[in-house]
Amino acid sequence: MGDDLVKVKICGITNEEDIAYISKKVHAVGVIVDVPVKTPRKISLDKAIELKKYVAPFTSLVTVLMPNSIEEVLEIYNALKPNAIQLHGFESLDFVKELNKLKNTGELNAHIIKVIHIPKDEEIDFKTLLNTAKEYEKYVEAILVDTKIESIKLEGKTHNWAVSKKLRESLEKPLILAGGLNKDNVLEAIKTVKPYAIDVSSSLEAYGGKKDLKKVDEFLEVIKKV
């Protein structure tokens, strides 16, 4: 993986085999911990702690959360010590500001990634979307754009990449592109958006929660063509 390549995070990892194999091939691996939605990719904090032992050196561990409180974030952070925390719900700006304060005091030593949900074209108010992203980016290390669907289900669906492109061009912090990426559309997505990184999960599965390692390899081979 050269520095000229878009960075890759593979998310929704649930087992030792997948994390040991995948973490040797990508920049970051993601675990979805105790989120309040039904998904086969959700694992417990204890399981996440166990999986961390299998992460390859120099690969970042990202914990995906939809927390109800600052205390919940700190509890998971202190137990797991991930490299980054991805806030994937509708966390308020004040909530993110509070986490940023904890970073400044040294209580939290992890990058913060905040998701921005991109709605269907007919529902997009780009000015509001951009203003929201600009407010959040003051307090985080990266903005992740994902497709907004009915009640967050952490399932991969694509959105209008032109919107993500405009956001990327307007923001100062790195933009991570997620939402329905697969080996057939990822080159077009990268060419259109030019993101700092991409985030992929469900398209690389054999079944819910279990990655198909052949699909992973095929996807990463496509990325090399960028």
Swiss-Prot record:
It catalyses: N-(5-phospho-beta-D-ribosyl)anthranilate = 1-(2-carboxyphenylamino)-1-deoxy-D-ribulose 5-phosphate. GO terms for biological process: L-tryptophan biosynthetic process. Keywords: Amino-acid biosynthesis, Aromatic amino acid biosynthesis, Isomerase, Tryptophan biosynthesis. CDD domains: PRAI (cd00405). One of its GO terms (molecular function) is phosphoribosylanthranilate isomerase activity. Pfam families: PRAI. It is an enzyme of class 5 (isomerase). Its EC number is 5.3.1.24. Signal peptide: none annotated. InterPro entries: Aldolase_TIM, PRAI_dom, RibuloseP-bd_barrel, TrpF_fam. Pathway: Amino-acid biosynthesis; L-tryptophan biosynthesis; L-tryptophan from chorismate: step 3/5. Transmembrane segments: none annotated. Belongs to the TrpF family. This is N-(5'-phosphoribosyl)anthranilate isomerase. It comes from Methanocaldococcus jannaschii (strain ATCC 43067 / DSM 2661 / JAL-1 / JCM 10045 / NBRC 100440) (Methanococcus jannaschii). The lineage of its organism: Archaea, Methanobacteriati, Methanobacteriota, Methanomada group, Methanococci.
